[in-house]
């Protein structure tokens, strides 16, 4: 089950890489009738479910969790929800790459924490260390670090042109 769990944990990252590097292809594939950010969100939710199932397949759940669980999970999820609240679906799911005009956000956590959604996700993963073997948490976290690096090299000329 270890190899399948590792594959499941890594499953979304090739998809995200492909979208980031082939934004116009994704916009064309979605066509005029479907919003590329919404379609990306739906696919991402399915892939996230596969990731979580992969973690559960190797987890040893126990109660109560260690004390470090609560602040890491709470602040990590706060960051995730706050990013979504400020950016919305289009801002969270590569809307800028897909040719949408997304306003620049400077409210917390932006301007204070670099890549707050990824930081929040990594914090949430670290909260689960008492239940999930370290190598799976590390693998998933390295996927986020890879995406942070990839997205830091954004070239405005590589953005998709809207087909609407």
Swiss-Prot record:
Positions of transmembrane segments: 31-52, 70-90, 132-151
Reported consequences of knocking out the gene: No visible phenotype under normal growth conditions.
Biological process according to GO: methylation; phosphatidylcholine biosynthetic process; phospholipid biosynthetic process
EC annotation from Swiss-Prot or TrEMBL: 2.1.1.71
Binding site for S-adenosyl-L-methionine: 74-76, 154-155
UniProt intramembrane annotation: 1-21
The reaction(s) this protein catalyses: a 1,2-diacyl-sn-glycero-3-phospho-N-methylethanolamine + S-adenosyl-L-methionine = a 1,2-diacyl-sn-glycero-3-phospho-N,N-dimethylethanolamine + S-adenosyl-L-homocysteine + H(+); a 1,2-diacyl-sn-glycero-3-phospho-N,N-dimethylethanolamine + S-adenosyl-L-methionine = a 1,2-diacyl-sn-glycero-3-phosphocholine + S-adenosyl-L-homocysteine + H(+)
InterPro entries: PEMT/MFAP, Phopholipid_MeTrfase
Broadest EC class assigned to this enzyme: transferase
Lumenal side: 22-30, 91-131
Entry GO CC: endoplasmic reticulum membrane; intracellular membrane-bounded organelle
Any GO molecular function: phosphatidyl-N-methylethanolamine N-methyltransferase activity
Membrane topology, from the record: Multi-pass membrane protein
Pathway the protein contributes to: Phospholipid metabolism; phosphatidylcholine biosynthesis
Stated family: Belongs to the class VI-like SAM-binding methyltransferase superfamily. PEMT/PEM2 methyltransferase family.
Name this polypeptide is given: Phosphatidyl-N-methylethanolamine N-methyltransferase
Species per Swiss-Prot/TrEMBL record: Arabidopsis thaliana (Mouse-ear cress)
Gene: PLMT
């Amino acid at each position: 089950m270890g190899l399948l769990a590792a594959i499941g944990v890594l499953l979304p990252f090739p998809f995200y890489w492909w979208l980031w590097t082939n934004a116009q292809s994704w916009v064309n594939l979605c066509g005029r009738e479907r919003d590329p950010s919404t379609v990306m969100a739906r696919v991402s939710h399915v892939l996230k479910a596969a990731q979580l199932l992969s973690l559960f397949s190797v987890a040893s759940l126990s109660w109560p969790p260690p004390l470090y669980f609560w602040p890491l999970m709470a602040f990590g999820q706060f960051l995730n929800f706050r990013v979504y609240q400020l950016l919305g679906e289009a801002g969270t799911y590569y809307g800028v790459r897909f040719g949408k005009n997304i306003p620049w956000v400077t409210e917390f956590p932006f301007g204070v924490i670099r890549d707050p959604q990824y930081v929040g996700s990594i914090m949430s993963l670290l909260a689960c260390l008492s239940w999930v073997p370290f190598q799976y948490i590390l693998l998933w976290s390295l996927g986020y670090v890879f995406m942070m690096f990839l997205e830091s090299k954004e070239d405005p000329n590589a953005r998709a042109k809207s087909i609407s």
